[in-house]
Amino acid sequence: MGVRLLYIVDPLDRLALAGDSSYALMLEAAARGWGVWTCQIENLGLVGDDAVCDAAPTVVKAATRPAEAFQTEPLAPHRLADFDIVLMRKDPPVDVNYLHATWILEHARGKTLLVNDPRGLRELNEHLAVLHFPHLTPPTIVTRSAARLREFQAQQGGAIVVKPEIGRAHV
């Protein structure tokens, strides 16, 4: 087997395959004859300074449903350094578990190719990043002040969308 890739992803049975870039990347890797392994962030860990994971060899096929697209073998222990490329593809929210995963990935730096740099994932907030492109965003306010939110809502003339800076809102 040629190139060995580890995809750190959401549970495979929850991927929306149509338009999912992680799935497209896995399909292309499979088409090239490369080895695909998958794991979730809770499968990452450290042994001393060595980043490790429990990952499943994964056969990827073109399909419309995850049950048809993925065939996985049982999880087995691996060092991240044993993979040629490690792709952090876990969707936000950026929560404590996500942050811990990026800290673990830092221990693989220089030992394998990390796609989606862990430092960059931590530093670029998913909700604030879009504000670098004001011509593409609706009027926006970032605040912890309820009074400012009410004032902004009045200025906008009604309903607004409110999101937490980190994680997901619990409704």
Give the positions of each predicted feature.
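Active-site nucleotide/adenylate-binding loops and adjacent lid/helix of ATP-dependent enzymes
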Residues: 2-31, 36-170
